[in-house]
């Protein structure tokens, strides 16, 4: 999806194209194995690796992202673990709260308990975004394998202009 907006001012024409926006860094409430292989950087690396909390079942979990400058985030795509066995066995975020540098911006969202991409409209200008996990769907036993205690998110992709 590519959209183009042209804004004309008295002296210049500015084009802003909707595109993927990448954080310059992130932090999280915790990471499994001290982040070795499971850190929040996995959330925007474009591959199937995931962020996992430190066996806390999503309780009091959060991830936050910083961008190099203020930008307009139109939406984000939230991706639970795609692999069906891992998806079933891990805890998954259900209710989330999204906040930004704007103290007036609060977005509550209930996520679906599935492993498909979920689009969340943001429509805010910010250099920082935080996702608090308010509740979770538990992991389940799969073919005799016990559920995991970790909260897992595979990818969060930001789309915006800036």
Question: Whereabouts are the PLM-identified features?
Answer:
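Extracellular carbohydrate-recognition regions
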Residues: 13-26
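Aromatic, loop-rich ligand-recognition surfaces of beta-strand-rich domains
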Residues: 32-106, 114-162
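Extracellular mucin-like PTS domains
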Residues: 1-13
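Positively charged, low-complexity intrinsically disordered regions
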Residues: 4-5, 16, 53, 162
């Amino acid at each position: 999806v590519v959209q183009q907006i042209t804004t004309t001012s008295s002296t210049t024409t500015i084009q802003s194209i909707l595109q993927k926006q990448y954080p310059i860094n992130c932090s999280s409430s915790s990471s499994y194995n001290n982040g070795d292989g499971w850190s929040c950087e996995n959330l925007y690396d474009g591959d199937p690796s995931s962020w996992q909390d430190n066996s806390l079942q999503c309780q009091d979990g959060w991830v936050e992202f910083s961008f190099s400058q203020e930008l307009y985030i139109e939406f984000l795509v939230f991706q639970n673990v795609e692999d069906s066995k891992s998806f079933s066995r891990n805890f998954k975020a259900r209710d989330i709260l999204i906040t930004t540098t704007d103290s007036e911006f609060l977005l509550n969202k209930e996520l679906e308990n599935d492993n498909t991409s979920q689009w969340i409209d943001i429509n805010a200008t910010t250099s920082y975004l935080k996702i608090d996990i308010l509740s979770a769907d538990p992991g389940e036993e799969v073919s005799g394998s016990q559920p995991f205690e970790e909260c897992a998110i595979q990818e969060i992709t930001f789309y915006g202009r800036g």
